[in-house]
């Protein structure tokens, strides 16, 4: 498993490192570079999207 990837429960908190590449979780809270996690309702977010500031939306979400 890639150490930069992490898994967290749906609606949980991602607690991963600076280079985290979350691809399988729906986080409500983002820590560090875990922002590519898709928020609830954005399950089809593209890999590599980023958070819009402090909001719970990804850059690839409508």
Curated annotation (Swiss-Prot):
GO CC annotation terms, alphabetical: cytoplasm; nucleus
Residues engaged in binding a divalent metal cation 7: 51, 58, 60-61
Q: Which GO terms describe its biological process?
A: cellular response to cadmium ion; cellular response to copper ion; cellular response to zinc ion; detoxification of copper ion; intracellular zinc ion homeostasis
Q: Which residues bind a divalent metal cation 6?
A: 38, 42, 45, 61
Q: Which residues bind a divalent metal cation 2?
A: 8, 14, 16, 27
The residues the record assigns to binding a divalent metal cation 3 are 16, 20, 25
TM ranges are none
Q: Name one GO molecular function term.
A: metal ion binding
Amino-acid positions noted as binding a divalent metal cation 5 in the UniProt annotation, renumbered to this chain: 35, 37-38, 51
Q: Where does a divalent metal cation 1 bind?
A: 6, 8, 22, 25
Q: Which family does it belong to?
A: Belongs to the metallothionein superfamily. Type 1 family.
For this entry, the protein name equals: Metallothionein-4
Write the gene name: MT4
